[in-house]
Amino acid sequence: QFSNIDIHSMVDSFNLSLNDFFENTSPDSTEENIQARVRGTLLMALSNKYHKIVLATGNKSEMAVGYATLYGDMCGGFAPLKDIPKTMVYRLSSYRNTISQIIPERVITRPPSAELAPNQVDQDTLPSYDVLDDILKRFVELKHSVAQITEQGHSLEVVNKITSMILKNEYKRRQSAPGPKISGNAFGKERRYPMTSKFKP
């Protein structure tokens, strides 16, 4: 069953309530995240009312760099893609469609986006997921250093940016829903780093 709930009035109400507090500031991801949190609230209300579990949709790549909204798209009781990198999600989707076409092709071929702002795509602020997932595998699963990763041909600037994002978003991952483990070093119980004191390895 597919249903649509219009969230415009709810998002507008939040923004109106925050107008005085946000005076003399420019719109940024704060306002964008309100949309995700409104959706999360509605999904959890439906879950509560009908005794169903909400599935969190975040994958390992997004969880690694914090491309998820706490109490928004991270809400849910189980995260089936939690340990699956984005590039593998695409491959699994394409494979599933060889059995029967249930995933719209546009979902697989369009540029990935959080869809919280017009014309927004993930690659505005991230490298391609092919690059990101390779860095992620080397840093998290193989436990390579920044120097070892750059020796594989990756830009030092990009590697520093991605590894820094991974470390800074430990606090988000601690609050994420549980999910299956398929890798040699999954986020959660296996890989836990400090969240405070400006920790740097």
Residue ranges and their predicted role:
Residues Q1-P201:
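ATP/NTP-dependent adenylation/nucleotidyl-transfer catalytic domains that generate, transfer
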